[in-house]
Design a protein with these regions (language model features):
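Phosphate-handling active-site elements
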Residues: 38-54
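Non-catalytic, low-structured ubiquitin/UBL-interacting segments
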Residues: 1-15
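Predominantly the structural core of cysteine protease catalytic domains
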Residues: 5-7, 22-24, 34-38, 59-186, ...
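Short cysteine clusters
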Residues: 28
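Immediate flanking context of iron-sulfur cluster ligation sites
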Residues: 14-23
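Acidic/histidine-rich, surface-exposed loop or edge segments in extracytoplasmic proteins
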Residues: 13-14, 56-60
C-alpha cells in the first residue's frame, strides 16, 4: 500500500523533528515517554532527559537491571514522582556499559513532572487523542516487516508473522486508505529508519500487536 494514496487526517510530526537513536540500549520506552512528556510540557521546552527517566524507571524495577527494558508502570511512576530535566541536565549515554558508573547529576536543572496514564487499546480512542493534538505512546509487538520499512509504503503484515520483540513508539498522526486507518509513528532508531525516523502502520498490523497505549495529562508541574 502506497503512502501517496493515503488521505492524511492528522500529522503533527513536525512538532518533534527527526527521531533520535537509542543505539543498542533497551531504552525505547524511555525515549517514547520522554517525547510525549516534552510535547505535554510545550512552550519550547526542548528534549527531556531520556537518561534521567530511564535511570529512575530502572530503580523502580525489581531487578534494577539497566541491560533490560522497563515496563509502563515503572516509567509512569518515575516521570510522575522523579520527573526529568532537559536533555542538557543529563545527556543520553548511547554506549553505557553494564559496569560503568551510572548516577544522575547532583543539579540537573529544572525538573518536569508529568502524569502518564493508560488508555483504551481501541484504535478509535487513539484517533480521538490524535485529533486533539496529543501524541499516544504505544507498546507493541514488532515483526520482521517493522524493521526495514519499504520506502513510500505502509507497514502491513499478517498477524501470524512472528513477533521479534516488544517495542515502544509514539503515534503522531493518522490517515485513511480504502476505508482503513493507518498510523504515523515516531521511532527511536535514528533517521535512517523509515522516513527520518517515522513510518506508517496499517491498522491491520497495529491492532493485533498493540499491548499498551498511554497519554500524558496536559497538566505539567515544574520544580
Amino acid at each position: 500500500m502506497s503512502i501517496s494514496s493515503l488521505a492524511i487526517t492528522v500529522d503533527f510530526s513536525a512538532d518533534f523533528g527527526a527521531a533520535r537513536s537509542q543505539g543498542r540500549r533497551p531504552t525505547c520506552l524511555a525515549f517514547a515517554a520522554s517525547d510525549c512528556h516534552a510535547h505535554a510540557v510545550g512552550n519550547g521546552c526542548g528534549e527531556l532527559s531520556v537518561e534521567f527517566a530511564f535511570y529512575h524507571a530502572v530503580e523502580r524495577m525489581v531487578a534494577k537491571d539497566r541491560s533490560t527494558g522497563v515496563n509502563f508502570g515503572a516509567i509512569s511512576t518515575a516521570l510522575g514522582v522523579d520527573g526529568q530535566p532537559n536533555e542538557e541536565g543529563w545527556p543520553y549515554i548511547p554506549d553505557l556499559g553494564p559496569a560503568d558508573d551510572w548516577s544522575p547529576p547532583v543539579d540537573p536543572g529544572d525538573i518536569f513532572h508529568g502524569k502518564l496514564g493508560r488508555m483504551s487499546l481501541d484504535l478509535g480512542s487513539v484517533r480521538d487523542e490524535l485529533d486533539k493534538g496529543i501524541p499516544v505512546l504505544l507498546i507493541m509487538d514488532v515483526s520482521k516487516s517493522f524493521f526495514q520499512p519499504a520506502a513510500g509504503r505502509i507497514i502491513n503484515a499478517a498477524s501470524t508473522e512472528r513477533a521479534e520483540g516488544i517495542h515502544a513508539v509514539i503515534a503522531v498522526g493518522y490517515g485513511h486508505l480504502e476505508n482503513a486507518a493507518s498510523y504515523l509513528v515516531r521511532n527511536s532508531w535514528g533517521e535512517k529508519w523509515g522516513s527520518n525516523g517515522y513510518a506508517w502502520l496499517h491498522e491491520d498490523y497495529l491492532e493485533p500487536r498493540l499491548r499498551v497505549a498511554g497519554v500524558f495529562s496536559q497538566e505539567v508541574q515544574t520544580l
